Regions:
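Hydrolase catalytic cores
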Residues: 2-6, 31-36, 52, 60, ...
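Amphipathic, non-transmembrane alpha-helical secondary structure
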Residues: 45-56, 101
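Alpha-helix N-cap/helix-initiation motif
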Residues: 43, 85, 89, 209-214
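Short helix-coil transition/hinge motifs at the ends and kinks of transmembrane helices
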Residues: 24, 39, 76-87, 200-205, ...
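Catalytic-core segments of hydrolase enzymes
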Residues: 1, 60-192, 197-198
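Aromatic- and histidine-enriched alpha-helix N-cap/loop-to-helix transition segments
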Residues: 42, 91, 95, 216-223
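Subtilisin-like serine protease catalytic core
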Residues: 1-46, 57-60, 67-72, 114-115, ...
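Short, glycine/serine-rich, charged loops/turns that create anion-binding
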Residues: 9, 37, 124-126, 147, ...
């Protein structure tokens, strides 16, 4: 995710980030805030502290490749449905909504490039006809995933709450490395992949790999948003978060 946004370009290493800069061009700055502990658990209090810290310390884009299951998630597939409406989500997770609103209304500056913040979320991967929350919140930008041929990815949530789609990959096209024989040619060489190649933790070590999901689509939108704001700053333009 971070590599998709801000990996340095033109350095002969790894991948090129959408807003990574390179060869004398400045890239965007990333503020990394840990939400989940080592057991993959996150409390609402931890989440709220991170969002408030981001708003208070200069971040203007909230890149969130996480969320609950869609309320339309397939029970047969073992999914536990999440909130169905904005009202239900707000009533169930009031601290989360309050923290998001704080970021959206208090990030940025009236004198800067943007007054307020952009909250960008992955729509979810249950192939459901509704985006998951918090992505489905009307003040957030919900991002669905498309495959290499620009068609909807086989796993991506969709529906009226989704505002944008971006490359998220789809391993259904070529097979999963290490799992499917058709991912390799007759010489055992990895063939073309339908997933996103990015910086990735491999066996606990920083590396590179292929990954799919709306979580990979989301940073494409965040990266483009960062580029747009950087250009607007050069032009001395000003926007509100709604614009």
């Amino acid at each position: 995710v971070a590599g998709t946004i801000a990996a340095v370009n033109d350095n002969g290493i790894g991948v090129a980030g959408i807003a990574g800069g390179g060869k004398g061009r400045k890239g965007v700055k990333i503020m990394t805030l840990q939400l989940f502990d080592g057991m993959n658990s996150c409390s609402l209090a931890m989440e709220a502290r991170a969002m408030k810290y981001a708003a208070d310390n200069g971040a203007v884009i909230l890149q969130c490749s996480w969320g609950y299951n869609s309320s339309k998630a397939n029970l047969i597939m073992g999914y536990t449905p999440g909130p169905a409406t904005e009202e239900e989500w707000a009533a169930t997770y009031p601290l989360e909504k309050e923290a998001l609103d704080y970021f959206i209304y208090n990030a940025g500056s009236p004198n800067g490039v943007i007054d307020g913040g952009l909250a960008i979320f992955a729509s979810g991967n249950e192939y459901a006809r509704q985006s998951s929350f918090p992505a489905a919140y009307s003040k957030c930008i919900s991002v669905a995933a498309i495959a290499a041929d620009y068609t909807p990815a086989s796993y991506s949530n969709y529906g009226s709450e989704v505002l944008l789609c971006a490359p998220g990959g789809d391993l259904e096209y070529y097979g999963t490395p290490g799992e499917d024989d058709d991912a390799y040619d007759e010489n055992g060489t990895l063939k073309e992949q339908g997933a996103i190649f990015s910086t990735l933790v491999v066996n606990g070590v920083a590396g590179y790999g292929y990954y799919e999901g709306t979580s990979m689509a989301c940073p494409h939108v965040s990266g483009v948003a960062a580029l747009g704001l950087a250009y607007a700053k050069q032009q001395r333009r000003h926007f509100t978060w709604e614009e």
